[in-house]
Amino acid sequence: MNQTIHRVSPISMSISELTTLLSSGVSVFEIFAGLLVVHLIYQRIRTRVKVYLLDFTCYRAPDSNRVPMSTLIETIYLDDKLDQESIDFQARILERSWLSNQTSIPRSLMEIPLKKSLSSVKIETMTTIFTSVEDLLRKNKLSPRSIDILITNCSLHSPSPSLSAMVINKFHMRSNIKSFNLSGMGCAAGILSVNLANDLLQAHRGSLALIVSTEALNTHWYIGKDRSMLLTNCLFRMGAAAVLMSSNDHDRDNAKYELLHVVRKNKAKDDRAYRCIYQDIDSDEKQGVSITKDVISVAGDMLKMNLTSLGPLVLPYLEQFQYVIQHILCKKLKIYESNSSYTPNFKTAFEHFCIHTGGRAVIQAMEMNLKLTKVDIEPSKMTLHRFGNTSSSSIWYALSYLEAKRRMKKGDRVLQIAFGSGFKCNSAVWRCIRKVEPNTENKWLDFIDSYPVDVPDSTNIRPG
């Protein structure tokens, strides 16, 4: 038999129940006072808990890890495992990559021959993670034992014990800390971690969460000849970020941003999307991460999917109305050609954009699809130029750039958007709740006055 389930408010009461209470000697005032208390408790429970971004830091490698283009191309030329065709291919990619001579890689990858080992990757991850966390805790005068939730993410290095356990061990965190380690989630894992932290902070009100995002280059540095796998060597560089979030109302005055929305989209059910970024072995049994030519078109599809869900949450009603009308005219009445369909103006919803620095093609595609200006893409373009593709932490380098430039004002809204293997497209929306001034821990501060710089579309780095 079908039964209808009725949802009732916790403060609802029938006439008979009220009569029973009154006849038992309870006053009307006491009844309504009790109902008011229950109502306030209910409202507090059901009301969305506000989650704040207190602070974050990015990792900046020492100059000894700097890899100028000339050094990198020389290392490639001296690698006897590569043929001339593979060497020329990497040189062409590097020349058009927008990367500068200031990006960094682990010391183990500068040796000839390259030194790939478990001990090397452990040194790399400990260096980036520990330095980022130490900087963040020192900057905010926090004890490691004050952290309630810990989330680490690193796509291609998943040791046992986990990276989160490594952090707990290093900083002697509490035994009851809620810790999570995410692996294999690609460059979109930074926002994914924010989403997980948000859910946990909503459930555990008043808690403090620490997110650490990084990638291990030593693990996936490719030493074969497959072109699709050589791309990662050309684009990925050393980096990490540590992020501090809170759901404690008392932290609002010290917070920089409030989290408004997180939208996550995944297309792993589609084989083409699933395999466009794929860890595999080549014909010579060499392990690497393959990036196929489908990645740009898949990313474009995923971007549309994400923005379709994000739009109604952030766009002004007029902008949404214009989109609906144009969509009807385009699809139903066929007045417009399909390639001239209306694209909502997301600049009406955001003052700033932090795009994942997946590469030159990713940033240019975002610029075209969202009709962004050179100023809009400047934080991501300069991040790619100065630090390279630092994977899941790249969106924090871009936000750090905006802070160093003193562009973040109270009330400003910023969109962080990232793509990752799977295939995923994740976005996070933050609102600045006070004017943000850069401090001494900002890794851009020493040279921010020289930015933005003119980034040539192509440079010649090949000898001879």
Curated annotation (Swiss-Prot):
Membrane topology: Single-pass membrane protein
Gene Ontology MF, one: fatty acid elongase activity
Active site: 187, 352, 356, 385, 389
GO cellular component: membrane
The protein's Enzyme Commission number: 2.3.1.199
Pathway the protein contributes to: Lipid metabolism; fatty acid biosynthesis
UniProt superkingdom: Eukaryota
GO annotation terms (biological process): fatty acid biosynthetic process
Localization annotation: Membrane
Keyword entries, A-Z: Acyltransferase, Membrane, Transferase, Transmembrane, Transmembrane helix
Alphabetized InterPro entries for the sequence: 3-ktacl-CoA_syn, ACP_syn_III_C, FAE1_typ3_polyketide_synth, Thiolase-like
Induction: Repressed by herbicides such as flufenacet and benfuresate.
Segments crossing the lipid bilayer: 21-41
Domain annotation FAE: ranges: 42-333
Tissue specificity field: Expressed in flowers.
Name of one Pfam family that matches: ACP_syn_III_C
Catalytic activity of the protein: a very-long-chain acyl-CoA + malonyl-CoA + H(+) = a very-long-chain 3-oxoacyl-CoA + CO2 + CoA
CDD domains according to UniProt: CHS_like (cd00831)
Sequence similarity: Belongs to the thiolase-like superfamily. Chalcone/stilbene synthases family.
The protein's name: Probable 3-ketoacyl-CoA synthase 21
